[in-house]
């Protein structure tokens, strides 16, 4: 990193608040020498977690005090109307006003999307932002899944826009031309799926600038046969949470199995580095951080129950996206694609 970069963190968001967000912020400052962080939240709580560990990083930390918090049970519209001094909203306003290049929050997903859409506005040609995150695959290449919960129900046009944005994002981040895009469906046959998925497929079939390959089923998500998988937020969120639960089960069973019997324990020590690598790849925390794409600013959503290491992943993602100026790059590519589609 060659120039200063400022992130705004919703320090009160998520299940653990400053107990997680503040230590993760300090770790990020350690890794990124030009990074500055604005912590938005209750100053007393934030300073309590900074007291014994901030040290040389204090000059790169700013606190904006507020005691108002968006709760996980708050309705998005109500939070938008009534919680105008919340830590989430103030963090987003810093991005809107150009005082920060990105915002990270582990708070209420619906409220975050509603506030971000109102404050940051969507890019030209985008009706709804979408949450997207990378997942591991059998090929070693990441797979992008969207939407992950920002839009519980979607029409065909929204799914089409998600496909375009996901394709552009993959190109920008991974410098890959024409990534393979698919719609998540209950079958691969062309006649399968509800009206929204069917109509989105027709739109994508007639779009040359998107490398649409057809439908994929749930068991193909992690094969790496496609790069971008599109679905509505209801399906995407359940898919993601189910996958995380299965990953945790597999890790737990593997650890339990390796502790049974003297010979197995001895063997496991010999191959410990390889086991650690496998477990790390399967750990959902390693992939924490979903990007709210389609906005004029950068917003990264962390899991609400993220621990320090997982939240740090979300902060690192925000740093990467800010360094690469993703909104500007997506805007340019998106305008080109939509212009070609509409011409």
From Swiss-Prot:
Organism domain of life: Bacteria
Location within or outside the cell: Cytoplasm
SUPFAM superfamilies per the UniProt record, alphabetical: Isocitrate/Isopropylmalate dehydrogenase-like
Catalytic activity: a fatty acyl-[ACP] + phosphate = an acyl phosphate + holo-[ACP]
Annotated metabolic or biological route of this protein: Lipid metabolism; phospholipid metabolism
Pfam families cross-referenced by the UniProt entry: FA_synthesis (PF02504)
GO molecular function terms listed in the Swiss-Prot or TrEMBL record: phosphate:acyl-[acyl carrier protein] acyltransferase activity
The protein's enzyme class: transferase
Gene Ontology biological process terms from the UniProt entry: fatty acid biosynthetic process; phospholipid biosynthetic process
Primary location: cytoplasm
Keywords tagged on the record: Cytoplasm, Lipid biosynthesis, Lipid metabolism, Phospholipid biosynthesis, Phospholipid metabolism, Transferase
E.C. number: 2.3.1.274
Listed InterPro entries: FA_synthesis, Phospholipid_synth_PlsX-like
GO cellular component terms, A-Z: cytoplasm
Presence of keyword Lyase: no
Record HAMAP family: PlsX
Family from the record: Belongs to the PlsX family.
Reported function: Catalyzes the reversible formation of acyl-phosphate (acyl-PO(4)) from acyl-[acyl-carrier-protein] (acyl-ACP). This enzyme utilizes acyl-ACP as fatty acyl donor, but not acyl-CoA.
Oligomer and partners: Homodimer. Probably interacts with PlsY.
Identification of the protein by name: Phosphate acyltransferase
Organism: Shewanella denitrificans (strain OS217 / ATCC BAA-1090 / DSM 15013)
Taxonomic lineage: Bacteria, Pseudomonadati, Pseudomonadota, Gammaproteobacteria, Alteromonadales
């Amino acid at each position: 990193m060659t120039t200063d970069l400022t992130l705004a963190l919703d320090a009160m968001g998520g299940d653990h608040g400053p107990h997680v967000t503040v230590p993760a912020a300090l770790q990020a400052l350690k890794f990124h020498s030009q990074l500055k962080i604005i912590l938005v939240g209750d100053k007393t709580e934030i300073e309590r977690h900074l007291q014994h560990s901030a040290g040389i990083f204090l000059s790169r930390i700013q606190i904006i005090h507020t005691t108002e918090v968006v709760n996980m049970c708050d309705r998005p519209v109500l939070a938008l109307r009534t919680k105008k001094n919340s830590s989430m909203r103030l963090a987003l306003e810093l991005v809107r006003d150009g005082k920060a290049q990105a915002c990270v929050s582990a708070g209420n997903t619906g409220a975050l999307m509603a506030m971000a859409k109102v404050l940051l506005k969507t890019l030209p040609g985008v009706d709804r932002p979408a949450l997207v995150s990378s997942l591991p695959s059998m090929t070693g290449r990441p797979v992008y899944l969207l939407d992950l919960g920002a839009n519980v129900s979607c029409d065909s046009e929204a799914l089409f826009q998600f496909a375009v944005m996901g394709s552009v994002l993959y190109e920008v981040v991974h410098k890959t031309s024409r990534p393979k895009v698919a719609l998540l469906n209950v079958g691969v046959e062309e006649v399968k799926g509800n009206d929204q998925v069917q109509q989105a497929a027709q739109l994508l079939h007639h779009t040359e600038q998107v490398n649409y390959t057809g439908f994929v089923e749930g068991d193909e998500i992690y094969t790496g046969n496609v790069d971008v998988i599109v679905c509505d937020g209801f399906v995407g969120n359940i898919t993601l949470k189910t996958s995380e639960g299965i990953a945790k089960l597999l890790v737990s069973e593997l650890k339990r199995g390796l502790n049974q019997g003297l010979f197995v324990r001895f063997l496991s020590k010999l191959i410990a580095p390889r086991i650690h690598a496998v477990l790390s790849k399967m750990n959902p925390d390693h992939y924490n951080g979903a990007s709210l794409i389609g906005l004029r600013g950068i917003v990264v959503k962390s899991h609400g129950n993220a621990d320090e290491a997982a939240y740090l992943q979300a902060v690192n993602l925000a740093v990467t996206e800010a360094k690469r100026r993703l909104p500007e790059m997506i805007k340019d590519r998106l305008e080109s694609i939509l212009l070609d589609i509409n011409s």
